[in-house]
Amino acid sequence: MDKIISLKYNSQFKKLYSKGESYVSPFFAVYVKRNGYRINRLGITAGKKIGNAVTRNRAKRRLRELYRLNTPYMKQGFDFVIVARFRTATAAASKLDSDFRRLLKEAEVLRDV
C-alpha cells in the first residue's frame, strides 16, 4: 500500500481553490489541478459548519479512505483538495463512492480501464 502524499501548506490549498477546477456533489466538493509531477497529492478540509471535532475527523477519515480506494483508477500528476460537507460523516459509503467516481469522471482523471 502506497503512502498518500498530502498537501500541507496553506499556499498549496489557496492555489488549488483559485486556479483549480471544482466539482461539487451534495456530500463534498473536489478541486483538481495538474501539478507537474508524476504523483498525486491530496488535501482534505472540513470546516466547523460540519460539526464538532469528532464529526469533522470522521468525515476526513471517510474521504481519505474513499481517495485511497480509488487511487489505482486515477491518472497521475494531479493535486486534489476534497472539502467535506455536512452530510459526509453520515452518508452511506456506497453513495459517497458513486459520487466521488462521478466527479472524477467529470474531471477526466480516471484511467481508461
Question: What residues fall within each predicted segment?
Answer:
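Positively charged, solvent-exposed patches that mediate nucleic-acid binding
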Residues: 1-113
